[in-house]
């Protein structure tokens, strides 16, 4: 069997090659991660959470008021649960280290409720569509 570039092979016999670009913002887009130290602390927290949840972080960037992640995780995990794990645990751990942050945020929430999730692939939708359509002639 030819190996698929960037695919993750599981002992159970399935292969997945799905990558997600995740973005979420701080509550009210407040600039919370304003120093290199704070950005690094958040990167470390997110990396720890990923390791505990079988999530592979391929790229990470912490901006003043939002997070960018390029991640991959087993198909049995849902995007919603992955984001919930990141946001929930990171907020709890962040407030333990920086309790003064709560005063900057009404209601004491670090993150807004919303997030963006987009799939990222090495083939465009059009390439996949043409490949599938081409399978008809291979019968």
Predicted regions and their residues:
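Basic nucleic-acid-binding interfaces
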Residues: 1-139
């Amino acid at each position: 069997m030819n190996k698929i570039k960037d695919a993750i092979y599981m002992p159970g016999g399935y292969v997945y090659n799905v990558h997600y670009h995740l973005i979420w913002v701080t509550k009210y887009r407040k600039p919370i991660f304003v120093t290199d130290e704070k950005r690094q602390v958040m990167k470390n927290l997110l990396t720890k959470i990923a390791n505990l949840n079988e999530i592979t972080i391929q790229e990470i960037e912490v901006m003043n008021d939002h997070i960018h992640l390029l991640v991959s995780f087993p198909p049995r995990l849902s995007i919603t649960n992955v984001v919930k794990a990141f946001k929930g645990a990171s907020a709890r751990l962040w407030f333990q280290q920086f309790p003064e942050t709560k005063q900057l945020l009404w209601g004491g929430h670090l993150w807004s409720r919303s997030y963006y999730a987009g799939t990222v692939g090495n083939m465009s939708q059009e390439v996949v569509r043409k490949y599938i359509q081409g399978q008809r002639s291979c019968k």
